[in-house]
């Protein structure tokens, strides 16, 4: 094989194998998990932007876990009344990154920061808080 083509081919193959072997959850996985959590909680919202800001992996017992921090912009096309004061589990308010009751007028955009958790699979993927594999 011509040497000038060998190095780029090796770089591309390595990138493909790294991407396919699990790696860390990226922006697409995080955005999908957040959309699914909001939909499941019946929050009438549209994810306008989403960006992973940091993350860290750990090995706990026999499991790999990943803590994923993000910034997001969420729009409420029809408005929304967030009832957070009595939220006892990770529900819509946790997904939105807010802790107290709040009213969002029609089309308001919330800029929020939050955290998602993923658990590793045996095949190298990640299971998000929405129960889906990425």
Predicted regions: what they are:
Residues 1-18:
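Sec-dependent bacterial lipoprotein signal peptides
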Residues 20-134:
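Cystatin/cathelin-like cysteine-protease inhibitor module
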């Amino acid at each position: 094989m011509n040497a000038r083509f060998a190095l780029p081919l090796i770089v591309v193959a390595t990138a493909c194998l790294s991407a396919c072997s699990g790696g860390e959850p990226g922006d697409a996985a995080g955005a999908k998990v957040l959309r699914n959590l909001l939909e499941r909680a019946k929050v009438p919202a549209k994810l306008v932007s989403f960006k992973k800001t940091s993350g860290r992996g750990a090995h706990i017992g026999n499991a790999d876990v990943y803590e994923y921090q993000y910034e997001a912009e969420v729009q409420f096309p029809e408005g929304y009344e967030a009832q957070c004061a009595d939220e006892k589990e990770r529900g819509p308010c946790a997904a939105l990154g807010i802790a107290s009751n709040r009213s969002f007028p029609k089309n308001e955009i919330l800029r929020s920061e939050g955290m998602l958790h993923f658990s590793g699979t045996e095949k190298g993927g990640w299971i998000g808080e929405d129960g889906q594999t990425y």
